[in-house]
Design a protein with these regions (language model features):
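Positively charged, amphipathic and often flexible ligand-engagement surfaces
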Residues: 2-544
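A short structural micro-motif
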Residues: 89, 102-107, 122-123, 618, ...
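Conserved structural-core and active-site-/substrate-pathway-adjacent residues in large, well-folded domains
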Residues: 90, 216, 301-302, 416-419, ...
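Pre-Walker A segment
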Residues: 183-192, 196, 227, 242, ...
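Active-site proximal loops enriched in glycine and acidic residues that flank catalytic Cys/His/Asp
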Residues: 218, 303-305, 335-337, 364-366, ...
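Terminal low-complexity tails and localization/encapsulation signals of metabolic enzymes
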Residues: 461, 473, 477-480, 484-613, ...
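Extended, amphipathic, non-transmembrane alpha-helical segments
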Residues: 642-648
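Substrate-binding/gating loop at the entrance of the active-site cleft, primarily
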Residues: 688-718
Length: 718
């Protein structure tokens, strides 16, 4: 058993836990409050803002229809559209292609690569994807995965199916591996503007002459070491110099710009390291911004995962309020419409720009981490998702947020990034006929959006500017980006995928998202195939965790930890319900020996023998308890542990020296054990099942809560 008393001289160990980065102003609080708000509540408000006059919707439909018909008239299934349509992610081959590319990126040795290729290729029906009048790009990608390089250049694909069988029998995995490498390079040319910034700038000239603008992105994943961060910083610095020279005074709106990823510039870009981030990352970002200001080019801060959003807003606020960066309209920020906080983030940025007499670039995108956000919320046991579960809800959010940006063009330069013709047409008509440079612009990804925006850019088209987001990087850095793009656009709901599918009518593609939502049985209803985190396991309730990126939850958790920081716990053995006296010793916090967590009383050998006898006597009465009632005991214990979780976290962190995430994981594991065994008992044990009897559990010190809870309840109900 454990009791507690207040220690008179213990040091408060949680005094500096999760201090707020900034005071929660009303606008910032609105962002936090909307983090995981119920989907229907968010969408109900947004659908009203995205509902347009009938005259406007008629114009939008006409423009969208014209764009789609023009696209389909010249569409031959080439490039990414052909690839994602050919290798649908619902097919075994499509999944194998993605898994293969993703896995090869992470496998350093050739033998393991070959073993993986052998395993994946043997299960893929690649022959069915060869020939059939499909485009060379699709065929080349297919052959690049399974045969030698020379066949990827074969134009006449008749008879290649039989040749494939012969070649795979003749050639080993290394040849296939080289084919995979070639296919990735081919696809890389489709998605990446150049391996170096100079190569990318040179390649961009032809489209710039036709009226397109560019924003360059130096490819790379999040930094894991200081050396990574320094390398990425040098890459950005070099790129800004090159882009600045190439801009030749064209300015922010007509000239090229750069996009930067904050997680690439600091290896600990997380809320838990906010003080380090503000002290170490902010000066780096400011230096890049100052260099961009010198050349008068735009610098966009790319959007990342939901748990980094508020930290990025603090960095943005510091940049906008910095007098050294005044008189420059090139600070940009990317906002993701699939996030429930998006409208409130825009309110904050608009207010920030107005208060500081600045004009800020805001790139509005649909969102890039949807599957990861859904999975993470479920795995972490959070109250709800930070993103919408239906694509149409994101489309509604995008339109509502676009209207907000267009209404603040005095302090905002809106940049609308979309490959969806219906969304594009909506923005075009929302913005109105009056246009001048700097009013707003469209944006698209290199290798994916040019066919659509060929119908937009130029006086003979819609006469609106489009900026191409242009990734720059080597073959090694492009694979992760490539896989993300193919996964993103291979989804069944993707416009890029659907426009290449002739079974999808034009009327479906130009449907007004607000009208679609209003026609649903329940407006804003969450997708019925995506369980909330609590319902992840179906019948068995998932344990609830803490959102360590939510400022309100951090503040509440901090107060609870501080209130229990001086608590001195006492652990005493019991035999047959009675406390046993014995010698006690202090338990110290392994991370701070001045913190006496409490005392523990050791049990003597004779008392252990008495405990075993008492347990033996209790077997008869416990065996009369039905499995259902035994399971109910475990459920009650789980609910109590969930309710007392914050206090347990403080104890575990002090006693075992665990970090907050590890402590949360341990308590959640204990709760899951209880509910799992309760559920299994109800499912598998009959009414006549007798208990296991006497058991003993020896647990490791490293898991003071979870291991005992894992072993003992299972024995109790078994």
């Amino acid at each position: 058993t454990m009791t507690d008393k207040v220690s008179a001289n213990a040091t408060p160990v949680f005094e500096s836990f999760a201090p707020p980065i900034r005071a929660q102003t009303p606008l910032r609080k609105a962002i936090t409050d909307a983090y995981r708000r119920p989907e229907a509540e968010c969408v109900t408000a947004l659908v009203q803002q995205a509902t347009l006059p009938e005259e406007t919707t008629t114009q939008i439909r006409a423009t969208a229809r014209k764009l789609i018909e023009a696209l389909r008239a010249k569409h031959k299934g080439t490039g990414v559209e052909g690839l994602v349509h050919e290798y649908s992610l619902s097919s075994q081959e499509g999944v194998a292609l993605m898994c293969l590319a993703e896995a090869l990126l992470r496998i350093p040795d050739m033998a393991t690569r070959d073993a993986l290729i052998r395993d994946k290729i043997s299960n893929g029906d690649w022959k069915s994807h060869v020939g059939g009048g499909r485009s060379l790009f699709v065929n080349a990608a297919t052959w690049g995965l399974v045969v030698t390089g020379k066949l990827t250049n074969t134009v006449n694909d008749s008879g290649l199916s039989a040749a494939l069988t012969r070649l795979i029998a003749r050639c080993g995995e290394p040849v296939i591996r080289r084919g995979v490498d070639m296919a990735m390079r081919m696809m890389g040319e489709q998605f990446v503007t150049g391996e170096t910034i100079d190569e990318a700038l040179k390649r961009a000239k032809s489209l710039e002459e036709r009226g397109f603008r560019y924003s360059y992105d130096m490819l790379g994943e999040a930094a894991t070491t200081a050396a990574d961060a320094e390398r990425y910083y040098k890459d950005y610095e070099t790129a800004i110099h090159a882009i600045g020279r190439a801009s030749a005074g064209r300015g922010i709106y007509d000239g090229p710009g750069i996009s930067i990823k904050l997680s690439a510039l600091h290896p600990r870009y997380v809320r838990a390291q906010s003080e380090r981030v503000m002290g170490e990352l902010l000066p780096k970002v400011k230096a890049l911004a100052a260099l961009s200001k010198k050349y008068n080019i735009g610098l966009n801060i790319d959007a990342e995962e939901a748990d980094r959003l508020e930290l990025s807003l603090d960095l943005l606020q510091s940049l906008i309020e910095d007098p050294d960066l005044a008189d420059w309209e090139g600070i940009g920020f990317v906002v993701q419409a699939y996030g429930k906080r998006c409208p409130f983030v825009l309110d904050f940025i608009i207010d920030l720009a107005r208060r500081n007499n600045r004009r800020v670039m805001v790139r509005l995108v649909k969102g890039a981490y949807w599957d990861a956000e859904i999975k993470r919320a479920q795995v972490d046991g959070l109250e709800d998702f930070p993103v919408y579960t239906r694509k149409v809800h994101t489309d509604v959010s995008y339109i509502a947020c676009a209207a907000k940006l267009l209404g603040a063009r005095d302090v905002i330069f809106p940049q609308f990034a979309t490959h969806n013709a219906q969304t594009l047409a909506t923005i075009y008509h929302l913005a109105g006929p009056d246009f001048k440079t700097g009013s707003y612009e469209f944006q698209c990804l290199h290798g994916m959006g040019e066919p659509l925006y060929d119908e937009v850019v130029g006086a003979s088209k819609l006469g609106r500017p489009a900026r191409i987001y242009a990734p720059v990087g080597t073959h090694e850095t492009l694979l992760a980006y490539l896989v993300r793009r193919l996964l993103e656009n291979g989804a069944n709901s993707s416009f890029v995928n659907r426009i290449g599918d002739k079974s999808v009518s034009v009327d479906e593609l130009i449907a007004d998202p607000a009208e679609v939502v209003r026609s649903m049985a329940v407006v804003g209803a969450r997708h019925d195939q995506i369980n909330l985190p609590e319902g992840l396991y179906g019948i068995r309730k998932n344990s609830a965790g803490f959102d360590l990126s939510n400022e309100e939850q951090l503040a509440e958790l901090s107060e609870t930890l501080k209130a229990n920081a001086t608590r001195a716990w006492t652990a005493e053995p019991q035999v047959a319900g009675a406390k046993v006296k014995g010698e006690s010793r202090p338990v110290l916090n392994p991370g701070d020996h001045s913190d006496v967590v409490g005392t523990v009383t050791e049990i003597a050998a004779d008392d252990v023998a008495q405990a075993m006898k008492a347990a033996e006597k209790a077997v008869a009465s416990w065996s009369q308890v039905s499995p259902t009632d035994r399971a109910a005991c475990l459920d009650r214990a789980a609910d109590i542990m969930q309710r007392e979780m914050a206090e347990l976290l403080g104890l575990i962190m002090r006693e075992a020296g665990k970090s907050m995430p590890n402590a949360i994981a341990e308590v959640r594991e204990a709760i899951d054990f209880l509910r799992y065994y309760a559920d299994q008992t109800r499912r598998t044990l009959g009414v006549a099942h007798k208990p296991l009897g006497q058991t003993a559990c020896i647990r490791p010190r490293t898991f003071p809560r979870a291991i005992f809870t894992g072993h003992i309840p299972a024995a109790l109900v078994a």
